[in-house]
Curated annotation (Swiss-Prot):
PANTHER family: OLEATE ACTIVATED TRANSCRIPTION FACTOR 3, OLEATE-ACTIVATED TRANSCRIPTION FACTOR 1-RELATED. Transcriptional inhibitor with a significantly increased number of target genes in response to oleate. It comes from the Eukaryota. The lineage of its organism: Eukaryota, Fungi, Dikarya, Ascomycota, Saccharomycotina. This is Oleate activated transcription factor 3. GO terms for cellular component: mitochondrion; nucleus. Gene3D superfamilies: Zn(2)-C6 fungal-type DNA-binding domain. InterPro entries: OAF3, Zn2-C6_fun-type_DNA-bd_sf, Zn2Cys6_DnaBD. Residues 18-46 bind DNA. It comes from Candida glabrata (strain ATCC 2001 / BCRC 20586 / JCM 3761 / NBRC 0622 / NRRL Y-65 / CBS 138) (Yeast). GO terms for molecular function: DNA-binding transcription factor activity, RNA polymerase II-specific; RNA polymerase II cis-regulatory region sequence-specific DNA binding; zinc ion binding. Pfam families: Zn_clus. SMART domains: GAL4 (SM00066).
Length: 891
């Protein structure tokens, strides 16, 4: 009898097949788009035969159908109540109230990113509600649909000046203002008010242009008679920043420049203090040197100088000289910003380094860096790049992006030296032939040591290139990446010298380059779905690295300034992406996604603001190691500048949300005032670029605080409409219509009835219904502003009014050319003019209506009696909002 065949039970393992590449994928790996399509650039057409079921790793947030959605397939449940949050730290324990507000998800005592099942993007969690997590966290997943946004709706902004031409990267503060219609309108409103007012004021003044007008601010220092407030001495601040420019002109250097002994630090100070300080505090941040070799080179350099009395350019001593100058300058910067006392560091702090950077610039430009390069020359360029980032002067430009030319030179020089990705290829042969007389010589560094140092330098260059992508959205210069095995780099990046961080950073490079390709290949059509997925993956990978490093005793990432910096870089990038989403969805009238994005934007902005305030409150303590403040300050400064713009953008949109009360707006404006006070009081006296932005932000605060009387957005719309009708447009510059195309459409719509330019209700109604229809869908959206948490922040962080730099220019009585300037001696001392010139007239500049001197009565008004009455309306509006002294910095 024939035995029945055994029926083999088939395995019911769900399989998915991509219709593009037919690559089979198991249920544990169901990305969309799949990796093959990403590799071949077919992400738009990557679809599966069946909908991709979202597994445990990719949970979809709780959803509900939005009946009025223009995209019925999108289902999102927006959280309405801020009490649905509960904060937990890394161990799952509830935080105290202070940690809830101050230590956000990237805080020192909490995970860098939240440990959630759906791998949500960062969000600040507040309150003591009973629920464990909000109803919606993480970016929307659109059931396989790729969503696109326009990150440059008005294109790139290219600014042409006498000294330079700059194309602003898409995430800089200038680009944020240029992209956002609300911030653009506010910017042009300020420019119009400043231009018209200062033109009239200059006609009454004898000295009209910078830098003489800086002397005007000595009036602030004399405002409080008999009061000693050294912290508010604005003239000293100006003089301090003026020194940066005074030292630029030091004369030409000859081929054999005779060494000026006062420019070269003493040998004992360099060998015993500078190099020892650099070994323990700078080398982990600057993996550019083989330290024993550097010490030997410094010894040879001083021996040569003591013999000849000159810096030789034949044997490369000039580049060792530049390395010594830059290391000394950076060491002194680190010490001065940490205020560390002690005899071991006092020789460095007492060195006069004012001429060091100009000397380095002269040496760089006087040699053939455009044709050939050496290892020491490349090290000088990288040290200069590092210094420009940390320095208090305006090294990288106001937006921190004027570094591409130097980075291009660095990357090109590195490739000329053979430094690149090929060094990380296993088994790739590298033949290094070290000639006699070269520096470093074969006696001090063999070929293997050269290769190891080359690998470190390439990782450091890569770190800078990718960092500026996250900070400013700059296009990466290095357009290649390579997956590298961790084990192959253990010998190069050791824990002992502190370079282990760069071994981990290489692991993130492919993700960073993918983010770069998504935003740079076509900024007008960015796949935001793929971009958010990449950002989430980047956060997860960085969280894993954070966990790995924290599990070791040698290095704690919470105390490492590089981990601190990268976490802030990711937060800045997240906020900039969310802001771009808000602007794009508003333009497309996609109110569902817009509401979600604006809520998430405000949450991450509030979270980062609390981080900044906590950082400033802890600056005097050993937060992140006080010697690292000179390095970490820079990323916090950039974040604070960006956050102020985002806060302004949110405040200007509050009129659209009916659940927001008038007192809530005022709370946000006061929160902005507190944030700016901490920002400028901590950084305004140290960083020139921060100090320059103070005056613009003070005018912003004036405009926003005017909301207690009228809505600032309506007021600005009215002003711009009048300017378009009656104002003069300068030749060669972008006109108001070019900068504000949406308001130009509004102007065309209302131009048939000029009287409507004064009807605020009609203007706002036309804007919301015809020009910006997204406003019609906002009245039922409940924007959670976290008012109670903002109040807690305001109560917790106090600032002494006597030390408040942001507020001092308002509180002091301004006496421009007053009694202090009424005598011949004061005129001579303030303006350095010849004694034969008569003294300037006395002016008391307090309020518009109580002016004396040349500005009698209404003479300060912008338009003359013969001008249009409609334009005169703008004059009255400016007088209602601003104080005359607000315009002094712009004279």
């Amino acid at each position: 009898m024939e035995e029945p065949k055994k029926v083999t039970k088939s395995r019911r393992r769900p399989m998915l097949v991509c219709v593009n590449c037919r690559k089979r994928k198991s249920k544990c790996d169901r990305q969309l788009p799949c990796s093959k399509c990403i590799q071949h650039g077919d992400t738009d057409t990557c679809t599966y035969l069946n909908d991709v079921p979202i597994g445990k790793k990719n949970n979809v947030p709780n959803t509900q159908v939005t009946p009025n959605s223009s995209s019925p397939s999108i289902v999102i449940n927006l959280h309405q109540n801020g009490n649905d949050y509960k904060t937990k730290n890394l161990n799952g324990q509830d935080n105290t109230l202070l940690k809830e507000i101050n230590n956000n998800i990237w805080g020192r005592n909490s995970p860098i990113f939240p440990d959630s099942s759906d791998h949500s993007p960062p969000t600040q969690v507040f309150g003591d509600g009973p629920n464990l997590k909000p109803k919606v966290i993480g970016h929307c997943r659109y059931s396989g649909e790729n969503q696109y946004i326009n990150m440059v709706p008005k294109g790139y902004l290219i600014e042409v000046k006498r000294s330079s031409v700059t194309r602003y990267a898409m995430w800089t503060s200038t680009s944020v203002e240029y992209r956002d219609p609300y911030l653009s309108c506010m910017l042009m409103f300020k420019k119009g008010a400043v231009k018209a007012t200062t033109e009239q004021m200059k006609k009454k003044m004898k000295f009209k242009n910078l830098p003489n007008s800086f002397a005007l601010f000595t009036a602030f220092d004399n405002a409080d008679d008999g009061k000693d407030k050294p912290n508010l001495n604005h003239a000293k601040i100006f003089n301090k920043f003026a020194e940066y420019r005074q030292q630029k002109s030091i004369g030409d250097l000859s081929e054999d420049h005779i060494l000026d002994t006062k420019d070269l630090p003493r040998r004992q100070a360099v060998e015993n203090c500078v190099l020892m300080f650099a070994k323990f505090h700078l080398c982990p941040l600057l993996p550019l040197f083989n330290l024993p070799h550097l010490m030997e080179e410094v010894k040879i350099f001083y021996d040569n100088v003591e013999k000849t009395g000159k810096v030789s350019t034949k044997n490369g001593d000039n580049w060792i000289y530049c390395i010594i100058l830059l290391l000394t300058k950076i060491c002194k910067l680190a010490i001065c910003m940490s205020n560390i006392p002690g005899d071991d560091v006092s020789p460095i702090a007492q060195l006069d380094t004012t001429r060091f950077i100009p000397l380095v610039h002269k040496y760089i430009m006087n040699h053939n860096l455009f044709r050939k390069c050496t290892l020491h020359q490349l090290q000088v360029l990288l040290l200069l790049r590092f210094y420009n980032w940390c320095a208090p002067e305006d090294g990288d430009g106001q937006q921190g992006q004027q570094n591409s030319i130097l980075m291009g030179m660095i990357i090109s020089s590195a490739k000329e030296l053979g430094i690149g990705w090929d060094l990380f290829t296993p088994g790739f042969p590298v033949g290094i032939d070290i000639s006699d007389g070269s520096r470093p010589s074969a006696q001090h560094m063999n070929a293997e040591e050269y290769t190891t140092l080359y690998q470190k330098i390439w990782c450091y260059i890569l770190f800078w290139d990718r960092k500026m992508l996250l900070v400013n959205g700059q296009n990466c210069i290095i357009q290649r990446s390579r997956d590298t095995d961790y084990s192959l780099l253990e010998a190069t990046f050791s824990k002992e010298d502190g370079s282990e961080f760069f071994r981990y950073f290489i692991h993130l490079d492919s993700l960073l380059l993918e983010i770069n390709d998504l935003i740079s290949s076509n900024p007008t059509k960015v796949n935001i779905t793929a971009l958010n997925n990449c950002m989430t993956s980047l956060e997860e990978e960085f969280r894993n690295i954070h966990t790995i490093v924290n599990s070791r005793e040698i290095l704690q990432s919470n105390d490492d300034p590089r981990f601190f910096e990268v976490s802030w870089n990711i937060k800045i990038a997240r906020a900039c992406i969310l802001h771009a989403e808000v602007v794009s969805y508003e333009k497309e009238c996609d109110f569902v996604r817009c509401h979600y994005a604006i809520q998430k934007l405000w949450e991450i902005v509030l979270s980062m603001c609390s981080d900044c305030m906590e950082y400033w409150s802890q600056r005097s303590e050993a937060f992140l190691g006080s010697l690292n403040n000179f390095y970490t300050n820079r990323i916090v400064e950039i974040a604070a500048d960006r956050l102020v713009h985002f806060v302004k953008a949110i405040i200007l949109r509050l009129h659209r949300f009916h659940n927001v009360k008038a007192e809530d707006k005022q709370i946000l404006v006061q929160f902005m005032h507190k944030f700016c006070s901490l920002y400028f009081t901590n950084f305004g006296r140290e960083y020139f670029r921060c100090f320059k932005s103070l005056f613009n932000l003070k005018m912003d605060y004036r405009v926003l605080s005017y909301s207690s009387v009228k809505d600032p957005w309506t007021v600005m719309l009215t002003f711009i409409l009048h300017e378009m009708s009656y104002g003069e447009q300068p030749e060669g510059k972008l006109s108001l219509r070019d900068r504000l195309p949406l308001i130009a459409k509004l102007h065309d719509k209302l131009s048939y009835m000029p009287s409507s330019f004064k009807n605020h209700d009609l203007i706002l109604d036309a804007w919301q219904t015809s020009i910006y229809p997204i406003c019609r869908y906002d009245e039922h959206f409940q924007l959670n502003l976290y008012i109670s948490e903002i109040k807690k922040l305001d109560e917790h962080y106090k600032i002494d009014k006597d030390k408040n730099l942001f507020e001092s220019f308002y509180n002091n009585e301004v006496k421009l050319f007053g009694e202090e300037f009424g005598t011949q001696e004061s005129c001579n001392s303030a303006f350095q003019k010849d004694s034969s010139e008569p003294p300037q007239e006395t002016i008391t500049l307090d309020e518009w209506g109580t002016l004396s001197g040349p500005y009698e009565g209404n003479d300060i008004l912008l338009a003359s009696e013969t001008d249009s009455k409609a334009l005169r309306y703008n004059d009255q509006l400016i007088q209602e909002i601003f104080n005359p002294k607000d315009f002094l910095p712009f004279l």
